[in-house]
Design a protein with these regions (language model features):
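Basic, glycine/lysine-rich polyanion-binding surfaces/domains
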Residues: 1-169
Length: 169
């Protein structure tokens, strides 16, 4: 089963200070996220309230943040407030589409021990992430993305929740 996931939006983060800046803002170790790897992270208030959860993908020359589409503008606006002298550029990527793929017989797979990072295949216009719960997330331009199927999107969302990976929206 494959489907577009219109729930997600993508933000590109570039500039020579991108990893160190995000390392200081997000909950995961972005400085040590290797090229071709992805990780889950959250963006929190100083008191620890989660504002957004996301996937961070290191493509080498930039980082991609995949989060709820409804939150992308507000989170980017808030992150920009803290840039100061850091060499970081945030760019909303409306031309990129997120798709999900699950095997028809995929069972929820709650993590016994959380993975700090997981592999991401990076090709010219596509990033494919092997998620810890047996699903695959694909970030691509629209012509390379799966068609939208409401039933498949519902199955994807249910699979993520049952696997312990809900999304904040």
């Amino acid at each position: 089963m494959q489907t577009r996931l219109p729930f997600f939006g993508v933000v590109r983060v570039s500039g020579e200070d991108r990893a160190s800046f995000l390392h200081g803002q997000l909950s995961n170790d972005i400085n040590n996220l290797a090229i071709g790897q992805a990780c889950y992270a959250t963006y929190n208030t100083p008191k620890g309230r989660v504002l957004a959860n996301m996937l961070v993908v290191n493509r080498g020359e930039d980082l991609l943040l995949v989060m709820a589409q409804d939150l992308t503008e507000a989170i980017v606006k808030r992150l920009r407030m803290f840039v100061l002298r850091a060499k970081v550029v945030f760019e909303l990527m409306p031309d990129l589409v997120v798709s999900g793929e699950l095997a028809d017989d995929a069972e929820p797979h709650p993590a016994a021990e959380p993975q700090l990072s997981f592999p991401a295949q990076i090709q010219e216009n596509t990033v494919e992430i092997a998620l810890p719960h047996t699903g695959r997330l694909k970030i691509s331009v629209a012509e390379n993305a799966a068609e939208y199927q409401a039933g498949a999107e519902n199955a994807w969302n249910l699979h993520e929740i049952r696997s312990g990976y809900p999304w904040i929206c």
